[in-house]
């Protein structure tokens, strides 16, 4: 959420920029699963690009010296910034590059009023694309930066992100993302099911290989080596 944090000072007068407000990343399992699905899907999409930083629920401080000006998008993407661990995203330490794309998943604790505050924050501090999804109503709201600022997009059916190239689909009753080449962003459960299936197929292949080796040995015992 957009946090109004108490500004503390070190003995030398240096401003402290907290890495957390002690609040959980998500209020419920549905919100958490969507956040993880989006974040991990983007990680995979940009796995070979060292200059794309992706984070979930990370404090973003856009203004140096102003620790009260902070928000933590559910997921944010900063193109042009290196991968790596950060306690928070201090924009003045990131070549003054603001996250270009942010995602928010609506939850009971983050209602429309809170989201309106976040919209103003993203508008003011340079976000190019803002995606807000309501999992209860299955509604996707999209804002894109124009010369007038962050402007709502009217037709969001099968919307494709200009920055990321990913496609948004809500026709199945929930938000589903696809990469530009049509690959689906999988949930944690789906990934585990596919892993289990792959392991079963591997076990079956190993069993067939063992059976073939047994048959081959029986042939050798009876007839000798196979002719070359």
Model-derived regions: residue spans:
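C-terminal interaction segment
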Residues: 2-27, 41-44, 60-73, 78-101, ...
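A short acidic/basic microdomain associated with nuclease active sites
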Residues: 48-60
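A structured, charge-rich N-terminal accessory region that forms the first stable segment of a protein
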Residues: 27, 32-45, 53
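A structural signal for short, well-ordered beta-strand segments and their strand-loop junctions
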Residues: 53-55, 131-134
């Amino acid at each position: 959420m957009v946090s109004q944090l108490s500004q503390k000072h070190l003995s030398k007068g240096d401003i402290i920029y907290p890495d957390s407000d002690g609040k959980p990343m998500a209020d419920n399992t549905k919100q958490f699963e969507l956040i993880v699905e989006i974040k991990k899907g983007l990680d995979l999409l940009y796995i070979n690009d060292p200059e794309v930083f992706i984070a979930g629920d990370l404090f973003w401080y856009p203004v140096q010296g102003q620790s009260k000006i902070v928000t933590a998008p559910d997921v944010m993407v900063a193109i042009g910034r290196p991968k790596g661990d950060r306690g928070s995203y201090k924009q003045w330490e990131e070549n003054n590059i603001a996250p270009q794309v942010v995602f928010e998943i609506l939850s009971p604790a983050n209602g429309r009023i809170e989201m309106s505050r976040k919209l103003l924050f993203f508008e003011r501090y340079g976000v190019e694309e803002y995606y807000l999804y309501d999992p209860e109503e299955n509604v996707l709201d999209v804002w894109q930066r124009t010369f007038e600022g962050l402007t709502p997009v009217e037709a969001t059916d099968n919307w494709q992100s200009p920055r990321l190239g990913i496609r948004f689909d809500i026709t199945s009753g929930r938000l589903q993302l696809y990469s530009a080449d049509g690959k689906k962003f999988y949930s944690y459960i789906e990934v585990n099911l596919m892993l289990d299936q792959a392991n079963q197929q591997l076990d079956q292949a190993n069993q067939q290989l063992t059976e073939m080796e047994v048959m081959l040995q029986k042939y050798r015992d009876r007839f000798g080596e196979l002719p070359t």
